[in-house]
């Protein structure tokens, strides 16, 4: 069993030393731009270099996040930024953009690339593609399950998230914030609309339907280590240093215990910010958060309350007992009541209380532990009955002391090993060092003093005295394993000269160590070749409605998606009906026979390996029936690429050599589309979505849990502004897709886009009426100068140009 790397988030300079002291073996951080957490403090270039130097002295690796989609106009600046990071000694960069991977391989081939979780690498096809591109490590989606990870076969290192916030959507597959407020998660500016309450018609109470509990795999570290995971990652670049110190130190302690087969309690982790914990999809045990803010450690339930006293029945497993100055939160349905304990509470048994009429008290035994809280400091009185409420410990004074201790610890998880050798040369003191870093690199240094040894007037300096002075390491995070003193102890020199010699050597070792990670910086100039298309305009049409196939005219391609048989909000694992899929595609091919368009089977954008196996089986059977059909997929290896691939620059398009058509991201702006089309080697390869409901989220998390699924409800969410978001199920039965209820419509821009050089446009008719195919003619008329908005609104009553 290999103990994985512990990778900690660092959102500011202040957090770096905390992460190192707490036991991180690597950290990840971001510059002021191009990172997926733009609202963290983040680092200037000078601060990044300082952080890299500091971390390397402590044998801690530094990974810099450049994990946003990159616009055409940014490519050259980003590449020169990466060149500087490489020169500074960054151990790797985390990247989302396919085009950036291509450019790094070309211009900075020795810079290690880690594929960000934003790339949504959920299957072996994507891993194979990235391995061929020289990627060293892949951060797997948080949605991956233990068995799926176990079955992955790759030579790349695998990294998974084990702790922190969970996005409701697959990372990299969420356009909700972008389309609802212009702040793109793929550009690092997510406004977190998932943390708001939504309504579902048929269910009375609004709820945090899109807000999962935080992830914690603390109790599964042994299983993770046995999966040969190379790195475990803690989320939280925007969280406090208290969170960082407590979470990282607890995970370090737990990893160290793994070696001896022991386990440790996770209660302390619950006391720093969390929305409640679950194991997420790792063991398919996701839960919805009960509130948007901090929940804390659940300690029990209230069995009795009065104005100045609370009695809480403590959970049997609780070892963290609240103390004076700690904070409690009492939660009951949508109500909560928080306060600070002002007197030392008493822990006792029920023997000290009379059994009354309260049912909760009657259910207890006399040996049950109860916590009696006599007085509280409060900002307000409780406005609901506290009995039968859940009690959470949300603040722990003792933690502040532990955080302070970690801050001042000044140590690192792995120290470099130092061998010192002292000798005389022409009576001048000479000190040599051999420093072995954690990466097995050896650093050597030598310094010679200016003051010679002399015959003593009174007392000589002994070899033991010199050895004692050489043992002092000041601030340096080294571990001395051997000191050789080649001196007979008969001469004299001031001790201050020995100390000076030692300091000079340590300073030289520091410089040599830092220098050993550096590389040469080079200026990168990209070729911005202007290209043009052939001028012929073609339309594509997305559908999952066989009626559309009968009436569609004037389109070159039809992307056919198989609709789910069961479109409820309940999710089922691997619910694949192969006969249904075969029948649907076969019928579609029969209807399309003799039509002018090419029929293309659109696979789901999320395809875990078991689904790929099922889809390929369907394809094989169809081929035997002489019903072959080309494929649209997002697996980096197809003929037709959907907009879920987040294509935002010409380099990304050029990198997908096997694809005939690639759809650019729908969340870009007018100037971005102009920049892409002029710089792409083959503009006729680009397609652009101009009409339809955009997929805002793809998720493996349920919206409804338990008995909620038994109610009558409608398949859409409603936000506080009464906007509706239709919800549909993937053909896999394992994912839900949330669409925008307001359609994207670029009808008035279509002529401008054609003049820019775009020649392929797509219209999304999935889940639309039987006559939505008429939208094609509306757009063709617009290309001829006849923009008919009234006709558009017949089929698309609510529409927007979104970010365009």
List the predicted regions and their residue ranges.
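Active-site pocket-lining/capping segments in soluble small-molecule metabolic enzymes
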Residues: 1-121, 125, 139-231, 238-804
């Amino acid at each position: 069993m290999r103990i994985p790397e512990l990778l900690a988030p660092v959102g500011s300079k202040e957090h770096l030393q905390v992460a190192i002291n707490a036991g991180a073996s690597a950290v990840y951080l971001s510059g002021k731009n191009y990172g997926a957490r733009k609202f963290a403090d983040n680092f200037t270039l000078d601060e990044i270099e300082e952080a890299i130097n500091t971390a390397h002295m402590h044998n801690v690796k530094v990974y810099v996040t450049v994990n946003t989609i990159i616009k055409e106009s940014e490519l050259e600046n980003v590449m020169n930024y990466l060149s500087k990071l490489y020169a500074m000694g960054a151990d790797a960069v985390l990247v989302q953009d396919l085009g950036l991977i291509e450019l790094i391989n070309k211009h900075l081939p020795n810079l290690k690339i880690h594929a960000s979780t934003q790339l949504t690498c959920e299957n072996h096809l994507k891993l194979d593609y990235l391995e061929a591109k020289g990627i060293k490590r892949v951060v797997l989606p948080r949605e991956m399950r233990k068995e799926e990870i176990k079955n992955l076969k790759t030579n790349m290192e695998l990294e998974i998230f084990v702790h922190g916030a969970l996005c409701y959507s697959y990372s990299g597959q969420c356009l909700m914030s972008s389309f609802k407020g212009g702040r793109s998660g793929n550009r690092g500016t997510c406004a977190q609309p998932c943390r708001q309450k939504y309504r579902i018609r048929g269910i009375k109470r609004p709820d945090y339907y899109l807000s999962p509990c935080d992830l914690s795999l603390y109790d599964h570290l042994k299983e993770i280590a046995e999966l040969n995971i190379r790195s475990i990652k803690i989320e939280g670049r925007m969280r406090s240093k208290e969170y960082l110190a407590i979470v990282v130190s607890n995970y370090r302690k737990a990893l160290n215990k793994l070696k001896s087969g022991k386990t440790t309690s996770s209660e302390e982790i619950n006391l720093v910010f969390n929305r409640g914990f679950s194991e997420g999809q790792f063991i398919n045990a996701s839960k919805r958060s009960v509130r948007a803010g901090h929940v804390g450690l659940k300690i029990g339930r209230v069995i009795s309350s009065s104005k100045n006293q609370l009695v809480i029945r403590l959970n049997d497993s609780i070892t963290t007992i609240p103390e004076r100055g700690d904070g409690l939160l009492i939660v009951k349905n949508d109500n909560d009541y928080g306060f600070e304990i002002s007197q030392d509470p008493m822990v006792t048994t029920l023997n000290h209380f009379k059994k009354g009429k309260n049912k909760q008290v009657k259910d207890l035994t006399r040996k049950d532990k109860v916590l009696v809280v006599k007085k509280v400091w409060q900002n307000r009185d409780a406005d609901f009955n506290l009995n039968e409420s859940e009690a959470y410990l949300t603040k722990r004074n003792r933690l502040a002391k532990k955080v302070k201790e970690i801050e001042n610890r000044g140590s690192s998880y792995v120290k470099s090993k130092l061998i010192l050798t002292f000798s005389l040369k022409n009576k001048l003191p000479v000190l040599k060092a051999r420093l072995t870093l954690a990466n097995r690199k050896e650093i050597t240094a030598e310094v010679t003093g200016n003051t010679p040894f002399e015959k003593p007037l009174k007392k000589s300096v002994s070899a033991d005295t010199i050895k004692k002075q050489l043992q002092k390491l000041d601030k340096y995070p080294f571990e001395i394993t051997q000191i050789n003193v080649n001196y007979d102890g008969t001469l004299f020199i001031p001790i201050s000269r020995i100390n000076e010699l030692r300091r000079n050597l340590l300073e030289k070792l520091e410089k040599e160590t830092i220098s050993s990670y550096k590389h040469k910086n080079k200026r990168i100039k990209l070729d911005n070749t202007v290209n043009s298309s052939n001028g012929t305009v073609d339309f594509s049409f997305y559908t999952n409605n066989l009626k559309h196939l009968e009436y569609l005219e004037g389109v070159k391609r039809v992307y056919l998606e198989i609709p789910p048989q069961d479109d409820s909000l309940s999710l089922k694992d691997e619910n694949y009906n192969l006969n249904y899929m075969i029948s649907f595609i076969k019928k579609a091919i029969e209807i399309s026979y003799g039509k002018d368009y090419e029929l293309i089977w659109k696979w789901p954008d999320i395809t875990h390996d078991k689904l790929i196996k099922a889809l390929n089986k369907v394809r094989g059977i169809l081929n035997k029936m002489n019903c072959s059909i080309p494929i649209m997929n997002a697996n980096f290896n197809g003929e037709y690429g959907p907009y879920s691939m987040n294509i935002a620059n010409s380099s990304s398009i050029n990198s997908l050599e096997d694809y005939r058509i690639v759809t650019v991201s729908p969340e870009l702006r007018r100037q971005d589309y102009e920049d892409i089309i002029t710089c792409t080697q083959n503009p006729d390869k680009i397609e652009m979505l101009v009409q339809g409901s955009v997929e805002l989220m793809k998720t493996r998390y349920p919206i409804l849990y338990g008995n909620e699924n038994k109610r009558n409800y409608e398949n859409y969410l409603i936000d506080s502004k009464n906007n509706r978001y239709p919800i549909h199920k993937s053909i896999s039965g394992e994912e839900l897709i949330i669409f925008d209820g307001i359609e994207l419509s670029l009808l008035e821009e279509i002529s401008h886009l054609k003049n820019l050089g775009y020649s392929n446009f797509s219209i999304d008719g999935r889940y639309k009426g039987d006559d939505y195919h008429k939208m094609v003619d509306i757009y063709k008329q617009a290309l001829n100068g006849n923009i008919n908005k009234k006709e558009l609104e017949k089929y698309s009553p609510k529409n927007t140009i979104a970010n365009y």
